[in-house]
Swiss-Prot record:
The lineage of its organism: Bacteria, Bacillati, Cyanobacteriota, Cyanophyceae, Synechococcales. This is Small ribosomal subunit protein bS20. The keyword Ribonucleoprotein applies. One of its GO terms (cellular component) is small ribosomal subunit. GO terms for molecular function: small ribosomal subunit rRNA binding; structural constituent of ribosome. Binds directly to 16S ribosomal RNA.
Length: 97
């Protein structure tokens, strides 16, 4: 247990940061799943609306991953790997007919 005031404050700060990081990671996972779901939807019914839906969800996911990397929630290599996996899935989905 913390013995002085500054150590107690650091515990509070660490807990606050942990919760914010958890929120960011959760949102990244959610947007990744949404993008993959939209890809599956496009596979079943390939039309312009579904294609635009895939592209917008991809942009949102990339944006949030970049922000998480910028705030040191994710390591830059981890962010790059996540973006690469999503992008490869989307690319194969959009090119396959």
């Amino acid at each position: 247990m913390a013995n002085n005031k500054s150590a107690k404050k650091r515990i509070q700060i660490a807990e606050r940061n942990r919760l914010m990081n958890k929120s960011y990671k959760s949102t990244v996972r959610t947007l990744t799943k949404k993008t993959l779901e939209n890809c599956e939807k496009y596979k079943k019914n390939p039309n312009e609306d579904n294609k635009n839906l895939v592209k917008t969800s991809l942009n949102k996911a990339f944006s949030l991953i970049d922000k998480a990397v910028k705030k040191n929630v994710l390591h830059k290599n981890n962010g790059a790997n996540r973006k690469s996996k999503i992008n490869n899935f989307v690319k194969t989905t959009l090119t396959t007919k």
